[in-house]
Amino acid sequence: MRIEICIAKEKMTKMPNGAVDALKEELTRRISKRYDDVEVIVKATSNDGLSVTRTADKDSAKTFVQETLKDTWKSADEWFVH
């Protein structure tokens, strides 16, 4: 599964150093519990976005990734140490 998270450039510049790598690691850890061969890409773009590809159950996988991403952001104080 390939997960591409696009974060608006103006938001990305406000993130603390190391936040993008920490987010990739945490999402990979959480999503790998349910799916094999997970690749998470986080990049700066003009708009926020999410795409999930290379999976047979695309709709349910995207829903799972959206929920996991939301939970990961909410719990950032628990896993992100800067």
From Swiss-Prot:
Name by which UniProt lists this protein: DinI-like protein Z3916/ECs3483
Top-level division of the source organism's lineage: Bacteria
Keywords assigned: DNA damage, DNA repair
Any single Pfam family the record assigns to this protein: DinI
InterPro entries: DinI-like_sf, DNA_damage-inducible_DinI-like
Keyword DNA repair: yes
PANTHER family the record matches: DNA DAMAGE-INDUCIBLE PROTEIN I, DNA DAMAGE-INDUCIBLE PROTEIN I-RELATED
GO BP annotations, alphabetical order: DNA repair; SOS response
